[in-house]
Swiss-Prot record:
Record GO cellular component, one term: cytoplasm
Subunit and partners: Binds to the ATPase domain of HSP70/HSC70 chaperones. Interacts with HSP70-1.
UniProt protein name: BAG family molecular chaperone regulator 3
Molecular function terms, GO-annotated: protein-folding chaperone binding
Residues with the Phosphoserine modification: S263
Region described as Disordered: 1-27, 249-268
Native species: Arabidopsis thaliana
Length: 303
């Protein structure tokens, strides 16, 4: 190790010189000489701490704070360092205060007591932090689930915008799953940043639900158009099929007749049909002139 070289350099103060006020450090820097070389070295002393009826001796640095002393006593007295208060000269000392500045010396006596108010505050803060952590974890899980459902929304949107058709049941199920996530978000009670995170996720889920409602309307309109086209198409087919069937039957009936006539005469036969005309008015009058004939019975009389 390099040894520190000390030297003196004159300094003019009030027109005169004063020696032994400057010293040279190993790096060549000239600084003001310290009056006491060991004045900045912290001193370790032993203090006696009473908790209940038991005394504990603690070796601690003189420049330590009362908070550090509480942490050292925590394992020995069995209390959390935030649940205790330290008294010195019958006065409670703050955890941020230093021992030497408060007059604590070697073999000084301190008293430690349990602080129920601080304990209650610590437990409340612990519960609050646990609730915040739980809410944050729940929101993270919901966000992950919403990301997964958002992929399905994008897929349905692509299919419908390209002219395809999606089952309505699939859209309804996806809307229900998003609404379940919205109910989970509404059940979370949070403040501050966690509340802002919850609000962002709620707005996100609502946006996806609205998009699915629009896709549902488009999908229903396309379904109606497809049903109309399918309903008209079979009717035209059956009409043409019936017409073809009748023409086929007539041709089948005419072929045997033509073959029989040609075989008997040897010449092509001409079929002449005689149609008898009936007058609907004359038939109605004939029906009116016909009267029912009363029956004739032979009656035999007895005396």
């Amino acid at each position: 190790m390099m040894k520190m070289n000390t030297g003196t350099s004159p300094s003019v103060i009030g027109g005169g010189t004063s020696g032994n006020e400057w010293e040279s450090r190993p790096g060549g820097m000239v600084v003001q000489r310290r009056t006491d070389q060991n004045s900045d070295v912290p001193r370790v002393f032993r203090v006696r701490v009473k908790y209940g009826s038991v005394y504990h001796e603690i070796n601690i640095n003189s420049q330590s704070s009362f908070g550090e002393l509480k942490k050292m006593l925590s394992d020995q007295v069995g209390l959390h360092h935030e649940d205790m208060k330290v008294l010195y000269k019958d006065k409670e000392r703050d955890s941020k205060m230093f021992l030497d500045l408060c007059g604590v010396k070697d073999r000084s006596k301190l008293v430690v007591k349990e602080d129920p108010i601080s304990q209650e505050k610590r437990l409340l803060a612990k519960r609050k932090n646990a609730a915040i952590e739980k809410a944050s974890k729940s929101i993270s899980d919901i966000s992950f689930e919403v990301d997964r459902l958002a992929g399905q929304v994008s897929a349905f949107e692509t299919v419908i915008n390209k002219g395809g058709k999606v089952e309505e049941k699939s859209l309804v199920n996806l809307i229900e799953m998003l609404m379940n996530q919205l109910l989970r978000l509404d059940a979370i009670i949070a403040d501050g940043d966690v509340k802002l995170m919850r609000k962002m996720q709620v707005q996100r889920v609502q946006k996806y639900v609205e998009a699915l409602d629009l896709l549902k309307v488009k999908n229903s309109a396309k379904k109606v158009e497809v049903n109309k086209s399918v309903r008209h198409k079979p009717q035209t087919q059956t009409r043409f099929e019936q017409r073809d069937l009748l023409s086929f039957v007539e041709e089948e009936e005419e072929e045997p007749r033509n073959s029989n006539a040609s075989s008997s005469s040897g010449t092509p036969a001409v079929v002449a049909s005689k149609w008898e005309m009936f007058d609907s008015a004359s038939t109605a009058k004939a029906a009116e002139t016909v009267k029912p004939v009363p029956p004739r019975f032979k009656w035999e009389f007895f005396d």
